């Protein structure tokens, strides 16, 4: 237990704030003990790697952080394998663990920052893969010390969303996540960038795909250890067919991804770039010069600086395209 604990190393934006109280635990029993001791005082917030948070001020309450580790095989057939993973496991360590064992499914999610528990809360995704399609169940403990296991069908997954993000589930803490992975070769290589990079290699393997994904991400995205950021700051908007066709008529070069016959996803980064924001700064916060979807802390930025930039970018996109883009990052 730490009082007035600095959160600088617990948020990838590098915002220098503190928590009134900081508690870590390494098992479900430890978490239950903390709850039973009365040390988890309201307000409270459970964080993972802090890679999807923007702290706007000091947190006048209790921050909880899981250090539950371990990867355990709980079921296996000739075709697939189910693993139960502690919520405190670093996500990319888990991806590497799977790739080394030739388990297919998570390789496209390489180098995404954060921890396993948060992956299930946020429904992380990249390059045609969403974690909801791999999750089997999510184990939780609530603020009253009660355990509950959610089948994936109960998790309410949609684009970067789940029931765990709802205000009424703020008191539900993820402890373990189980994933089903394939033992058979199964790749998702539909994104053009991936296919182009794979041409540099003599063949496709899990290790090669992971290396390609890492190379693509490192080229586009700044290292938060060097320049504070939370990865993609905005969600890609999904619009109806009629609105999409009107936009396409005006901007025939606009990239897009078909969701279904009625809905189309438009890259927010492209729209931000078209508004002239790529590489531009507003005080100590800026739009990254290689990926307009990413907002960065150039040094010494406060949460309010990032929000001011976010608001300005959103206003520009709304004025030019008539589309509201929404932050993927959670403001605290």
Swiss-Prot record:
Needs which cofactor? Answer: FAD
What is the E.C. number? 1.3.1.98
Enzyme class at the top of the EC tree: oxidoreductase
Kindly list the GO CC terms recorded for this protein: cytosol
Q: Which GO terms describe its molecular function?
A: FAD binding; UDP-N-acetylmuramate dehydrogenase activity
Q: Which domain of life is it from?
A: Bacteria
What are the positions of the active site?
160, 232 (proton donor), 328
UniProt pathway annotation: Cell wall biogenesis; peptidoglycan biosynthesis
- State where it is primarily located: cytoplasm
The protein's UniProt keywords, in alphabetical order, are: Cell cycle, Cell division, Cell shape, Cell wall biogenesis/degradation, Cytoplasm, FAD, Flavoprotein, NADP, Oxidoreductase, Peptidoglycan synthesis
Q: Where in the cell is it found?
A: Cytoplasm
Stored Pfam families: FAD_binding_4, MurB_C
Q: Does the keyword Signal apply?
A: no
InterPro entries tied to this protein: FAD-bd_PCMH (IPR016166), FAD-bd_PCMH-like_sf (IPR036318), FAD-bd_PCMH_sub1 (IPR016167), FAD-bd_PCMH_sub2 (IPR016169), MurB (IPR003170), MurB_C (IPR011601), MurB_C_sf (IPR036635), Oxid_FAD_bind_N (IPR006094)
Q: Which HAMAP family match?
A: MurB (MF_00037)
Q: What is this protein called?
A: UDP-N-acetylenolpyruvoylglucosamine reductase
Q: Which organism is it from?
A: Bacteroides fragilis (strain ATCC 25285 / DSM 2151 / CCUG 4856 / JCM 11019 / LMG 10263 / NCTC 9343 / Onslow / VPI 2553 / EN-2)
Top-level taxonomy:
Bacteria, Pseudomonadati, Bacteroidota, Bacteroidia, Bacteroidales
Gene this chain is encoded by: murB
């Amino acid at each position: 237990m730490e009082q007035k604990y600095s959160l600088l190393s617990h948020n990838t934006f590098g915002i220098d704030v503190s928590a009134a109280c900081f508690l870590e635990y390494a098992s479900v029993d430890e978490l239950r003990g903390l709850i039973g001791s009365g040390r988890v005082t309201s307000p409270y917030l459970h964080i993972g790697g802090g890679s999807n948070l923007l702290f706007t001020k000091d947190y006048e309450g209790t921050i909880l952080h899981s250090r539950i580790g371990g990867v355990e095989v709980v079921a296996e057939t000739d075709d697939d394998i189910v693993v139960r993973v502690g919520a405190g496991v670093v996500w990319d360590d888990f991806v590497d663990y799977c790739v080394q064992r030739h388990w297919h499914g998570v390789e496209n999610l390489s180098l995404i920052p954060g921890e396993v528990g948060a992956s299930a809360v946020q429904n992380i995704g990249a390059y045609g893969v969403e974690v909801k399609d791999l999750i089997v169940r999510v184990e939780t403990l609530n603020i009253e010390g009660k355990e509950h296991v959610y089948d994936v069908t109960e998790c309410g997954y949609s684009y970067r969303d789940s029931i765990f993000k709802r205000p009424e589930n703020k008191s539900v803490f993820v402890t373990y996540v189980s994933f089903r992975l394939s033992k058979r070769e199964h790749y998702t290589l539909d994104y053009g960038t991936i296919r182009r990079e794979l041409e540099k290699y003599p063949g496709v393997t899990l290790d090669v795909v992971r290396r390609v994904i890492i190379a693509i991400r490192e080229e586009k995205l700044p290292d938060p250890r060097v320049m504070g950021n939370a990865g993609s700051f905005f969600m890609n908007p999904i619009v109806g067919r009629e609105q999409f066709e009107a936009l396409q008529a005006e901007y025939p070069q606009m990239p897009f991804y078909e969701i279904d016959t009625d809905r189309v996803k438009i890259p927010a980064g492209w729209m931000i770039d078209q508004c002239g924001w790529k590489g531009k700064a507003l005080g100590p916060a800026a739009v990254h010069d290689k990926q307009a979807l990413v907002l960065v802390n150039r040094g010494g930025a406060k949460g309010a600086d990032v929000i001011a930039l976010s608001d300005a970018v959103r206003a520009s996109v709304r004025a030019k395209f008539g589309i509201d883009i929404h932050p993927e990052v959670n403001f605290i």
